[in-house]
Amino acid sequence: METIAKHRHARSSAQKVRLVADLVRGKKVSQALDILTYTNKKAAVLVKKVLESAIANAEHNDGADIDDLKVTKIFVDEGPSMKRIMPRAKGRADRILKRTSHITVVVSDR
């Protein structure tokens, strides 16, 4: 049984979160949680929260056994970017893009 958890509008760029997502794709959830716990990146905290949510969803909604679960799919899509203005010298201004991402984790017991 596949179970999904999503975090939409996560305040980190998709490029940075994908680096962490690639570390846990295809792993057992216990091993994935260990990897994320000791990965020293902000994105690891975001991905870990979504993975824990997916595990809880599988246990509560589908009655799955946690020991059998694997991360079957994990993907990160770009979310909307917030545009901000950075004042510069001589009356000019630059646009700053504060990027967001949508993190999706699918766990399965197969």
Swiss-Prot record:
Mention one GO biological process in which this protein takes part, according to its record. translation
- Positions the record marks as coiled coil are none
Q: Does the keyword Membrane apply?
A: no
Q: Cite the GO molecular-function annotations of the record.
A: rRNA binding; structural constituent of ribosome
UniProt xrefs under InterPro entries = Ribosomal_uL22, Ribosomal_uL22_bac/chlpt-type, Ribosomal_uL22_bac/org-type, Ribosomal_uL22_CS, Ribosomal_uL22_sf
**GO CC annotation, single:** cytosolic large ribosomal subunit
Self-association and partners = Part of the 50S ribosomal subunit.
Q: HAMAP family per the record?
A: Ribosomal_uL22_B (MF_01331_B)
UniProt function note = This protein binds specifically to 23S rRNA; its binding is stimulated by other ribosomal proteins, e.g. L4, L17, and L20. It is important during the early stages of 50S assembly. It makes multiple contacts with different domains of the 23S rRNA in the assembled 50S subunit and ribosome. The globular domain of the protein is located near the polypeptide exit tunnel on the outside of the subunit, while an extended beta-hairpin is found that lines the wall of the exit tunnel in the center of the 70S ribosome.
- Listed name of the protein: Large ribosomal subunit protein uL22
Q: Which organism is it from?
A: Erwinia tasmaniensis (strain DSM 17950 / CFBP 7177 / CIP 109463 / NCPPB 4357 / Et1/99)
Instruction: Show the taxonomic lineage.
Output: Bacteria, Pseudomonadati, Pseudomonadota, Gammaproteobacteria, Enterobacterales
